[in-house]
Amino acid sequence: MMEESGIESTPPATPPPPSTVVASPPPLTSGATRPQTVPSPSGISAFTPGDFSSPVPSVALTSTLPPMQSSVPPLPLSSISSPLGLSGPYGIPSASFASPAAGPPLSTGPPLGPVLSAPPMGPPTTGFSVSGGYDITRGHAGRTPQTPLMPSFSSASPMPGIVTNPMMQQPVSGGLDVSSPITFPEDVEDPRVTPDSNAPGGLWGFIKGVAGNPMVKTVLDKTKHSVESMITTLDPGMAPYIKSGGDVDIVVTSDKEVKVAAVRDAFQEVFGLAMVTGEAGQSNIAPQPVGYAAGVKGAQERIDSLRRAAVIHEKQPVVSVENFIAELFPDKWFDIGCLILDDPGYGIHIETFTQATPVALEHVQQAQSLTPPDYNLRWSGLLVTVGEVLERNVPNVSRTDWHQAFTGMSRRQMIYSAAKALAGMYKLRLPSRTV
């Protein structure tokens, strides 16, 4: 019957696959699990995408199946039907289609050869297989892949007679830490932007720009004052060095720190910068002056003694401090300090006094009793000071600073307050150019 129907009994031979397609599986003959149609002598109709009636499930054929030879003679055309419902004369194996996407129409001319199946589903490897012992330089036409695990892929042009896999090629994801050798271009400066050569730059330009700003000057002054305050708080001994200098030079007629430090702090507070030093001067009166006149006399004698001894020049501004006791009311005695500023250069002479500190009558009477009647300086005061009497009679009291024990305010603070007022009056009387 096969001879009468005009169908050749010899099955078509499958030509060897092209050398460019490496991963294509060997074609299956009519003995495969799916039937295959044979050419019909009738006319060839065009293969169009519309010939599919429903999506066809994909059948993945692996390249590990050996070629299978047919042991059954080919069947007549009438007994063979395409499982895909194709209207064309060529039955395409279902393994050739991995998705319902439509392929390109085939030519209406005579076919060049049997239709070959497409490569299996998966990422395009172009002959590359991730397996041990495989040479990674194979299949790259002599080119070195970018990384050992990610070879470079090239899309080959479709060959006639080969049905390509229309599935979208997805990149390999997960499990591979691949570092890309891609380098990015460096930023290039815009040649249209030219720097202003006239504008000052750097730290010096910034300082010149803000030097004339009054607000910045005020902030800098406050910052400087804060830094100086912090330094002097942490180390009070640094104050004379930080604020020393300027046009104000004062000599104190004593080498005792309680007097020199108080006058220095006061003048530096008023003038900002002031050089204050101490020189021991002689009062030439009794150790404990009594009365205002004796106090003023003792302070002035200290100044004159330094000038006579040429310790200071004749126009040197001098500040002298002398403490005395006075009976302001009957049987009510007070300790007072006298401060004198003498500046012969500008003809300035100022006198001021500290606050009065009460002294008990019994302590004054004891100091009087300890002074001999024939004491030669009895006209100016007493031989024994009030501080010495308090030191003998009151425990934990020093003769040099007994004011702290009786008033809570040290003698230095009392002298500082009076010296600050003295410096303020002196500043007002000085010419403006000097200030």
From Swiss-Prot:
Primary location group: Golgi
Result of knocking out the encoding gene: Knockdown of prrc1 results in small eyes and severe somite defects in embryos.
GO MF terms held by the record: protein kinase A regulatory subunit binding
Entry keyword set: Cytoplasm, Golgi apparatus
Compartments, as annotated in UniProt: Golgi apparatus; Cytoplasm
One biological process term in Gene Ontology: somite specification
Tissue-level expression: Expressed in the brain, heart, testis and ovary.
Record region (Required for interaction with PRKAR1A): 296-389
PANTHER family documented for this protein: PROTEIN PRRC1
Protein name as it appears in the record: Protein PRRC1
Species this protein is from: Danio rerio
Organism phylogeny: Eukaryota, Metazoa, Chordata, Craniata, Vertebrata
Gene (UniProt): prrc1
